């Protein structure tokens, strides 16, 4: 059995088949317990590994397939998903979109000279193949390229990009938001990658987030202009607009404006000639283009160049989704959306009237006076100043249901195309504006009618465009999603679909169309725990229970959030408090249930972090090392209390201890020594006081406690707390429970953790001092005698032969070892030691206002 699988260089001798890496050896052991890890196929998880560099240890990255419905649910809650997986398990995650492939051709949609020497342009293209000297990567602080653009660059350019990034962090530390790091580009067509860290969006700190994004762009420009004068072209993505949740429109405007301010009107000696703003996603391309036009003015490209669009073909009908202005379209027919009593109401009607001219309004009113009936849904006029023959005005009558009007008006417009021999028609996103039809519902109705028309009128050749206003990105996403769904359905029924939508592309063993979760972590345990949690979340039906003692520490703000979640998501949330156990029971429809569960888990992670920080401040104060300056700068500090987890050499004592675990049915996978100088100093101070009180008698016991994985690191960081242990019956008092009987612990673990493959047991030195018989009403140790000032130090289950010890202060225990076990048998391996690996807490992003945990 290997006790040192925290870090190790990956190596494998293919000729002999011999594993020469400690980490691969550990992975082999895990493969015996979790057979799906060996498959490496798209049905389970697809692991790849990066070998160790410096002290950062190994990284694991798995791609977990999910279905399209689950992808939609998770995409709507991507921030919460990523935050929970990072804060709960230490894993970085991103969602792989099922509709990412798009058009593979590079397309320039905007171009403008910023200065006489430097041109800015907007491109729809894949940054992994975009031809420039330097590509900017949207990176995180740790430069762990586990998903999104970062992962795509590593896959295309080679793992040396990740290795070089790890070396950078090992040498210089994390990269703060607004800063950059530069590495080689591997096999990419560019010469360098500039890893820029953008801000994580906080609604309450809009100005601060915008400032950090501006600093990131300025850092990029300073590098390509002043530090590396060989760079002539640079490509920049929409930094922070992905999982960092920076609003897309604000993001692109900030980037373009920062570039303009940094370059225009400032003489400089530089070889830089071109700045490319690049994305392969249509909404981002449209946002970059709109921001550039708004800030820099009209594009200097020819008018014929437009962004690429989604398209599908059914029989003789071509259906397209484009981003643009409905009044600027060129087609036989442009469709208008009007109030029958006032043609000037509504954004679409106003835009069309302004472009078409007052003659159109006069004809509309005249035609309405002659032909109008209360049941009429479509009125036809000439196009006048628009680039069309006719305008079909859809009339929204207030007395009819809006979805019904949309359905019948759409059908009537298409039927008129046959009557008037129309070959092209452009629709706005009918119903999604003032009519307030949900964008998904409107898209479904419009697609239903178009596809029904295509099947019923096979011989009629018609091009239908849905024209989405450039800034209506959510509507564009809804329509694109509907097209992707319909394309898939139609391809199964042998309809004619363009080759670009049928192409089967594979990415890391998965089809590019297949939605998935990219998961990246430092070790196999955290990867397994995160994967197991994801599976539990996705297996929910209409009921779920969250068990977490931090529920007791929810403040008014959190309870207001719970109330709001009940209202907006149509779920019921019930708080259940019983001795030793606190739960939230959530019931509701599956999609709402998953959304609410992730929001609650995210909230509990933040409360847990706030509580841990309070414990840290208490530790510093107990040592007399807490200052006002520390308190002021705490939120700016990347680390507070640092601890080490290190592999343990195979001493005889640990070998004997391992045998005791195995006798109790717990197979040991790994043991790590915990080293926390701050926690140890506080513990030793307490121990010295107790030894003086007991006149040097033995004051401590070596005891054990099982802890859920999500609390293992926080125990190493701030010590044992009642809220971190597994639930137990507080029959000896409301304290922190330990046992010296491994057999009892193992039996309890098998009952409580029957579904968990891994069990985590801390071995601790516990200051038990004077102890007495415990009682359920104890909230502190009883006095040594009735009326005495001094009290006992702990309580036990049986004074004459104690097995269970209860303390009431976390400073009375120090974690020494963490044993990772499984309840299933695994083949034992040789002992080996390895290098130490530093751990620190994950950065906490705080509450929007104040602290509810008082």
Curated annotation (Swiss-Prot):
Binding to poly(ADP-ribose) does not affect its activity. The keyword Hydrolase does not apply. This is Protein mono-ADP-ribosyltransferase PARP9. ADP-ribosyltransferase which, in association with E3 ligase DTX3L, plays a role in DNA damage repair and in immune responses including interferon-mediated antiviral defenses. Within the complex, enhances DTX3L E3 ligase activity which is further enhanced by PARP9 binding to poly(ADP-ribose). In association with DTX3L and in presence of E1 and E2 enzymes, mediates NAD(+)-dependent mono-ADP-ribosylation of ubiquitin which prevents ubiquitin conjugation to substrates such as histones. It is an enzyme of class 2 (transferase). Changing residue 737 to A: No defect in ubiquitin ADP ribosylation and the interaction with DTX3L. Residues 107-296, 306-487 form the Macro domain. It is found in: Cytoplasm, Cytosol; Nucleus. One of its GO terms (molecular function) is histone binding. It comes from Homo sapiens. Macro domains 1 and 2 may be involved in the binding to poly(ADP-ribose). Macro domain 2 is required for recruitment to DNA damage sites. Macro domains 1 and 2 are probably dispensable for the interaction with STAT1 and DTX3L and for STAT1 phosphorylation. SMART domains: A1pp. GO terms for cellular component: cytoplasm; cytosol; membrane; mitochondrion; nucleoplasm; nucleus; protein-containing complex; site of DNA damage. PROSITE patterns: MACRO, PARP_CATALYTIC. It is linked to Overexpressed at significantly higher levels in fatal high-risk diffuse large B-cell lymphomas (DLB-CL) compared to cured low-risk tumors. Overexpression in B-cell lymphoma transfectants may promote malignant B-cell migration. May therefore be involved in promoting B-cell migration and dissemination of high-risk DLB-CL tumors. Keywords: ADP-ribosylation, Antiviral defense, Cytoplasm, DNA damage, DNA repair, Glycosyltransferase, Immunity, Innate immunity, NAD, Nucleotidyltransferase, Nucleus, Repeat, Transferase. PANTHER family: PARP/ZINC FINGER CCCH TYPE DOMAIN CONTAINING PROTEIN (PTHR14453), PROTEIN MONO-ADP-RIBOSYLTRANSFERASE PARP9 (PTHR14453:SF70). It comes from the Eukaryota. CDD domains: Macro_Af1521_BAL-like (cd02907), Macro_BAL-like (cd02903), TCCD_inducible_PARP_like (cd01439). Belongs to the ARTD/PARP family. Expressed in lymphocyte-rich tissues, spleen, lymph nodes, peripheral blood lymphocytes and colonic mucosa. Expressed in macrophages. Also expressed in nonhematopoietic tissues such as heart and skeletal muscle. Isoform 2 is the predominant form. Most abundantly expressed in lymphomas with a brisk host inflammatory response. In diffuse large B-cell lymphomas tumors, expressed specifically by malignant B-cells. The lineage of its organism: Eukaryota, Metazoa, Chordata, Craniata, Vertebrata. It catalyses: [protein]-C-terminal glycine + NAD(+) = [protein]-C-terminal O-(ADP-D-ribosyl)-glycine + nicotinamide. Induction: Up-regulated by IFNG in macrophages and in B-cell lymphoma cell lines. Up-regulated by IFNB1 or viral infection. Down-regulated by IL4 in macrophages. GO terms for biological process: cell migration; defense response to virus; DNA damage checkpoint signaling; double-strand break repair; innate immune response; negative regulation of catalytic activity; negative regulation of gene expression; negative regulation of transcription by RNA polymerase II.
């Amino acid at each position: 059995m290997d006790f040192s699988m925290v870090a190790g260089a990956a190596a494998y001798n293919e000729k002999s088949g011999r594993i020469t890496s400690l980490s691969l050896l550990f992975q082999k052991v895990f493969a015996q317990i979790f057979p799906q890890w060996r498959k490496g196929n798209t049905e389970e998880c697809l692991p790849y590994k990066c070998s160790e560099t410096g002290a950062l240890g190994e990284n694991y990255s798995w791609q977990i397939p999910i279905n399209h419905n689950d992808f939609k649910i998770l995409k709507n809650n991507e921030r919460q998903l990523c935050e929970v997986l990072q804060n709960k398990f230490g894993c970085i995650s991103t969602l792989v979109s099922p509709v990412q492939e798009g058009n593979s051709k590079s397309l320039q949609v905007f171009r403008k000279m910023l200065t006489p020497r430097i041109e800015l342009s907007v491109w729809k293209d894949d940054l992994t193949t975009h031809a420039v000297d330097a590509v900017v990567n949207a990176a995180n602080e740790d430069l762990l390229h586990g998903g999104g653009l970062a992962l795509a660059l590593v896959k295309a350019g080679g793992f040396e990009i990740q290795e070089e990034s790890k070396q950078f962090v090992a040498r210089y530390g994390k990269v703060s938001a607004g800063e950059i790091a530069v590495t080689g580009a591997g096999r990419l067509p560019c010469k360098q990658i500039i890893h820029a860290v953008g801000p994580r969006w906080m609604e309450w700190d809009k100005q601060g987030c915008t400032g950090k994004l501006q600093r990131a762009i300025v850092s990029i420009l300073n590098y390509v202009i002043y530090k590396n004068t060989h760079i002539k072209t640079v490509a920049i993505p929409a930094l922070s607009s992905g999982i960092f949740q920076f609003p897309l429109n604000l993001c692109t405007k900030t980037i373009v404006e920062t570039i303009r301010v940094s370059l225009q009107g400032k003489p400089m000696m530089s070889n830089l000639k071109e700045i490319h703003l690049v994305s392969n996603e249509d909404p981002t391309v449209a946002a970059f283009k709109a921001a550039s036009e708004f800030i820099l003015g009209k594009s200097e490209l020819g008018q014929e160049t437009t962004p690429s669009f989604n398209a599908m073909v059914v029989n003789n009908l071509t259906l397209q989704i484009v981003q643009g202005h409905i009044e600027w379209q060129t087609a036989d027919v442009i469709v208008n959306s009007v109030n029958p009593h006032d043609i000037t109401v509504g954004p679409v009607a106003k835009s069309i009237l302004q472009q078409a001219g007052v003659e159109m309004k006069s004809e509309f009113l005249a035609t309405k006076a002659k032909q109008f009936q209360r049941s009429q849904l479509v009125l036809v006029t000439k196009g006048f100043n628009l680039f069309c023959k006719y305008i079909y005005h859809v009339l929204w009558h207030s007395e009819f249901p809006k979805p019904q009007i949309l359905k019948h008006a759409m059908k009537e417009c298409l039927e008129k195309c046959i009557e008037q021999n129309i070959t092209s028609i452009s629709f706005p996103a009918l119903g999604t504006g003032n009519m307030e039809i949900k964008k998904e519902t409107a898209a479904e109705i419009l697609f239903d009618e178009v596809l029904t028309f295509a099947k019923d009128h096979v011989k009629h050749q018609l091009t239908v465009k849905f024209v989405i206003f450039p800034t209506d990105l959510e509507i564009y996403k809804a329509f694109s999603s509907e097209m992707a769904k319909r394309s898939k359905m139609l391809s199964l029924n042998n309809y004619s679909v363009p080759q670009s939508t049928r192409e089967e592309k594979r990415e890391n063993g998965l089809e590019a169309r297949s939605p998935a979760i990219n998961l990246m972590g430092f070790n196999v345990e955290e990867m397994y725990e995160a994967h197991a949690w994801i599976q539990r979340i996705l297996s929910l039906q209409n009921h779920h229970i969250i068990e977490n003692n931090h529920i007791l520490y929810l403040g008014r703000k959190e309870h207001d959030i719970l109330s709001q979640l009940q209202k907006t998501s149509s779920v019921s949330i019930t708080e259940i408090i019983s001795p030793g156990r606190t739960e939230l029971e959530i019931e509701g429809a599956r999609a709402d249930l998953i959304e609410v569960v992730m929001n609650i888990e995210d909230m509990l992670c933040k409360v847990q972090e706030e509580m841990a920080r309070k414990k840290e401040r208490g530790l510093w104060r107990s040592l007399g090392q807490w200052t006002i300056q520390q308190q002021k700068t705490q939120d700016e500090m990347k680390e507070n209390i640092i601890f080490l987890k290190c592999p343990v050499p195979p001493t005889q004592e640990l070998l004997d201890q391992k045998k005791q675990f195995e006798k109790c049915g717990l197979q040991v996978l790994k043991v790590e020594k915990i080293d926390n100088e701050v926690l140890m100093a506080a513990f030793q101070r307490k121990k010295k006081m107790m030894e003086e009180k007991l006149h040097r008698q033995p004051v401590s016991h070596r005891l054990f406690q099982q802890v859920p994985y999500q609390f293992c690191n926080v125990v190493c960081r701030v010590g044992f707390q009642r809220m971190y242990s597994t639930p137990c019956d507080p029959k000896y008092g409301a304290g922190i429970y330990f046992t010296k009987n491994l057999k009892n612990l193992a039996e309890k673990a098998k009952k409580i953790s029957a579904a968990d493959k891994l069990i985590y047991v801390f071995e601790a030195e516990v200051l038990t001092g004077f102890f007495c018989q415990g009682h359920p009403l104890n909230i502190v140790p009883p006095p040594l005698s009735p009326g005495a000032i001094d009290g006992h130090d702990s309580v036990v289950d049986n004074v004459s032969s104690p097995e269970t010890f209860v303390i009431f202060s976390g400073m009375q225990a120090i974690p020494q070892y963490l044993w990772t076990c499984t309840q299933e048998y695994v083949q034992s391996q040789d002992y080996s030691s390895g290098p130490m690996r530093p751990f620190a807490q994950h950065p906490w992003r705080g509450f929007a206002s104040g602290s509810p945990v008082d």
